[in-house]
Amino acid sequence: MKLADVESTMQKSVEATLRSFNTIRTGRANASLLDKIVVDYYGSETPLKSLASISTPDASTLQIQPFDRSSMGAIEKAISLSDIGLTPNNDGQIIRLNIPPLTSDRRKELVKLAAKYAEEGKVAIRNVRRDAIDSIRKLEKSGEISEDDARDQQDQVQKLTDKFSAKVEQLLSDKEKDIMTV
């Protein structure tokens, strides 16, 4: 496993963690809250963002304007059945989602959820490290690289692991501040 591949895979783990963070609701409206919602549209599971334009007219409202008005009911149903905890208001042309302010208990729950996502990201990074070090050891055992080269490569992999784990920690810290800001 090349060092560039290790770095690329670790970067993807950080990006996946960031995508998970974006699904956590803060006190402000954010279109990424709806990223994971899929709508049963004429019998096929379709992502909401491919059926409608999503905008944020103000800090506490999400506005969904379907490209096809006949999909309004299906979109409304998908939002109601999702776990985002918002009730859609349909006026026949636009669906609005009002984002209520978060209670302090809910904020604490969301911080715990963010910490869980961060831990999952760090576990993924450590798994990449483990795989890389295993492949370095195999190369060393087979005699393809020397013991010194193996140690150097393992040190480089560890430095990458530390770097990307710190990135995840920074993302978590930023998300916690975002969630706890009233």
Curated annotation (Swiss-Prot):
Q: Name one Pfam family in it.
A: RRF
Q: Which GO terms describe its biological process?
A: translational termination
Q: Does the keyword Phosphoprotein apply?
A: no
Q: Where are the transmembrane segments?
A: none
InterPro entries membership: Ribosome_recyc_fac, Ribosome_recyc_fac_dom, RRF_sf
Q: Where in the cell is it found?
A: Cytoplasm
The job of this chain, per UniProt, is described as: Responsible for the release of ribosomes from messenger RNA at the termination of protein biosynthesis. May increase the efficiency of translation by recycling ribosomes from one round of translation to another.
Protein name (database record): Ribosome-recycling factor
Query: What organism does this protein naturally occur in?
Result: Synechococcus elongatus (strain ATCC 33912 / PCC 7942 / FACHB-805)
